[in-house]
């Protein structure tokens, strides 16, 4: 099978702290890959390096067979949720996504309605995002990540703030993405989410990535 991401001997330091330690791993196309670990274990740093948000101090990363570099173009065809999504608080979810769609190639008002409904949000809701719950903002961030129909999704702590119904709904959305042949990298501190969804699992601890299954 084809690998969509190749991480090769990646190290990252913040001052004297060694946050990624010689990390190497391949992520196969069309699967849900889980990375489980406590807060501060290095999960988010690895995700940011894969997306090109952070530059590794050594090692290489390939996404869709293209090397990710600090001075190269942002990796294409990726939907990303890393940390709590930021939106304009005085605008509705639909209005926020319309602004983002104006900067993107594929997205339009029909796409916006579809992705909002997909994650369980009402596209006609007028409530400003500043009055959204954390779970609603997470859903909106997920909708944003889906707007350009990416083949690869990088999801970091996607279930934060969701109630039990929201968790079930978003799990089903993620399973549906796999059924469409998309690849998902899911980082979480919650072992239950990882076990429920993932085809492969790695554990991150003190910057060291270990294959669990």
Sequence positions of predicted segments:
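The feature captures the beta-strand-to-loop junction immediately N-terminal to the Walker
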Residues: 36-38
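Helix-to-loop junction immediately C-terminal to a conserved catalytic motif
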Residues: 51
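Conserved ABC transporter NBD signature motif
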Residues: 59-74
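Conserved ABC ATPase "signature" region
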Residues: 98, 109-124
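Catalytic Walker B motif of ABC-type/P-loop ATPase nucleotide-binding domains
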Residues: 153-157
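H-loop/switch region of ABC-family ATPase nucleotide-binding domains
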Residues: 188-189
């Amino acid at each position: 099978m084809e690998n969509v991401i190749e991480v090769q001997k990646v190290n990252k330091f913040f001052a004297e702290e060694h946050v990624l330690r010689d990390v190497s791993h391949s992520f196969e196309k069309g699967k849900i890959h889980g990375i489980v670990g406590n807060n501060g274990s290095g999960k988010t740093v690895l995700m940011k390096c894969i997306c090109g948000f952070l530059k590794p101090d050594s090692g290489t990363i390939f996404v869709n067979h293209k090397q990710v570099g600090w001075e190269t173009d942002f990796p294409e065809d990726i939907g990303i949720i890393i940390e709590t999504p930021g939106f304009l608080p005085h605008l509705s979810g639909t209005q926020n996504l319309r602004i983002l769609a104006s900067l993107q190639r594929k997205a339009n008002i029909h796409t916006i309605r579809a992705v909002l409904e997909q994650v369980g949000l009402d596209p006609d809701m007028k409530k400003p995002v500043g009055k959204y719950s954390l779970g609603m903002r997470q859903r909106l961030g997920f909708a944003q990540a889906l707007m350009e129909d990416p083949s690869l999704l990088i999801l970091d702590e996607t279930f934060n703030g969701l109630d039990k119904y929201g968790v079930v709904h978003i799990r089903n959305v993620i399973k549906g993405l796999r059924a469409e042949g998309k690849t998902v990298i899911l980082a979480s501190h919650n072992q239950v989410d990882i076990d429920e969804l993932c085809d492969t699992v790695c554990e991150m601890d003190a910057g060291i990535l270990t294959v669990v299954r």
